[in-house]
Amino acid sequence: DVPDLQFHFSSAWAYDMYDYGKMPLHDGFTILPTLLKPKSRGTVSLRSSRFDEAPVIDPRYLSAAEDRETLKRGMRIARDIVLSSAFDGLRKGSELNYPAGEWTEDVIQQHMEQATECVYHPVGTCKMGTDSEAVCDPTTLRVRGLQGLRVVDASIMPDVISGNTNAAVVMIAEKAADLILSK
């Protein structure tokens, strides 16, 4: 078994963790349950042959039923943590900002649809491997079908690792440096 959830504890709270302008100006905290092994797969495709046009990105977050169930479990765990006696001095009574009240399946589903966002570790848009969906050769990190182009970042990871991607990306970069220098 490998972990399928990670909990990010933040010393700020907001409905959108990336919109600092809308964060309340008083004490609070957030627990973000994060999927470590998502099954949902999005797409990145070219809008046109023009270099100055942004690609079409469809993340398809939570399109896999298993991801929705895992995240619901994570939300319940986070709520249990916040409501535990260890957090009594950190919240006002039993106050939770959202979703408030009874946690029905509908309330949890609505919150997931409104508040889900990508947190820190997107991978796989230039997957390395030998299968038909692989873009990069795992032995050279070169993009198949193009000359002179390697991908050296988290986008070559076929799947997100259970944990933060920084150390793995450093290892990918070290391998790429060895490949380039040994040429």
What is the meaning of each model-derived region?
Residues D1-A168, A176-K183:
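FAD-dependent oxidoreductase catalytic-site/capping-region signature
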